[in-house]
Amino acid sequence: MSELENILGINFKKGTKILEATNSSKKVKKGSIFFGLPGVKEHGSKYSEDALNMGASLVVHNDSNAHINNDDIFYIKDLEDRIVNFLNALYDIDISNNNFFGFTGTNGKSSAAYLCHQLLIKFGYESLYVGTLGIQFNQNKFNKTFSTKTTPDIFELFDILNNNKFEDAGNICIEISSHALDQKRLSNIGWFNSTSILNITSDHLDYHKDIESYRDAKFEIYKMQSSIKLIDEDSSKYKDDYDFVQNDEYKLTTISNKNNFSDIFFRITEMSPHKSFFYVSVNEPPNVYQSIKKKKYKFSCNLFPEFNIHNLIFSICSIGFDKFEENIINDLSFLNLPKGRCEVIRDIPSNVIIDYAHNPEAIDNFLSSIRDYYKNLVVVFGCGGDRDKSKRTKMLKAAIKSSSKVIFTSDNSRSEDFENIFTDAAHNNNIEDVVKIKDRKEAIIHASKILPNNGCLVILGKGHEETQEEKNKTIFFSDHEVINEIYK
């Protein structure tokens, strides 16, 4: 028997060639092995024969209720326990030799993972970023073709590592969405260097149904074995609800800028859109960093506002303080935020910021954080169609609260009517200073025309995205490109 046969515990037909593995029947190619696994709505075994018809060499599944009479389809009861060893052997990659840094949270996942990625590269390590922005190996260009999901599943992750010729003992900074945690996409990875919950507010209730289910999904990240488990202090109040957190030998490390006695306390001493200074006091570090207990570290960076410093603290704590000096100001001015994350557009005559904020808390936090730096905020944003309707009125309320004028526009209306989306958003809101313009490009142009000299145009919701979904069609659209056209 071959190594692959031994791992699965089955005999392949003579001459069987396996070139790649997938759990998606849509990705099956000639030479694939298809893994039929439990899905959100149905079991993948349902697509076993479809996979063979598309060229799969064979199919394996763990559905005890499926009775399929085909010599190329195998039932393996403990299939999920064998997946990682199989993929290691197939791609000649030992995934356990890589260092994983996982970040989840309602807001900030992309920024924290990307900042961690940049820090590792700066200190001479190879690093791979995986998340909403796509994938980036070291400082190469972003590749957005591997997955449409924020977090890949284990098959997609191996495909990414294989295609990037990623060496063992590398570093992988990965965003982990609540959907991925609920679906246990990465539960097969045996060990994470660090796992972090940046914050928990209400989001994705179209999927999770209620805030308790959403929070349960977020805390699943601590079921992944890791020696550094970080959490913001506001979210840590829920930790007693989870026995697996209480019984873990590696305790949660809390991070706060409000409580001086938090495990990790940070304070911003100076902040502006161009330069910020802060310090970190290590009161009670993670188990593996006891040598830095009671130490204090000073930093400078080009990030703002406060929540981006908060995200950076998680990145620093994830890789460890041994990379930094205790008695100097550690200069982190080389760090940049991802495209479309609190992105100040440079070299144009007006103040323009593009950000990805697309839920009530993110909009409120973002606008309230930057309004001290600009006298008038003109905000362009919309609400997604076919998504949680309950947050629409809250999103508009947050935008109205901190702005002098709001331009409500389209943001992936999908199959819904734009007018209905606006009606939901306007409910119980004073819309005296709200202008409704369906065409997003026209909305941005209008906002630029009414922008006061000392004001700031803030474009929210799409960030780095370059598509717009309307009436089941996806078209190219970029907030950045519109700004370039206006100010070129």
Regions found by a protein language model. Give the residues of each.
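Residue-level signal for inorganic ion chemistry
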Residues: 32, 51, 86, 103, ...
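N-terminal leader/targeting and accessory segments in enzymes
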Residues: 1-89, 223, 267-270, 300, ...
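Adenine nucleotide phosphate-binding catalytic loops in nucleotide-utilizing enzymes
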Residues: 4-6, 208-215, 219, 233, ...
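Walker A (P-loop) phosphate-binding motif
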Residues: 88-137, 142
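Short, polar loop motifs at secondary-structure junctions
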Residues: 59-67, 131-134, 233-237, 257-259, ...
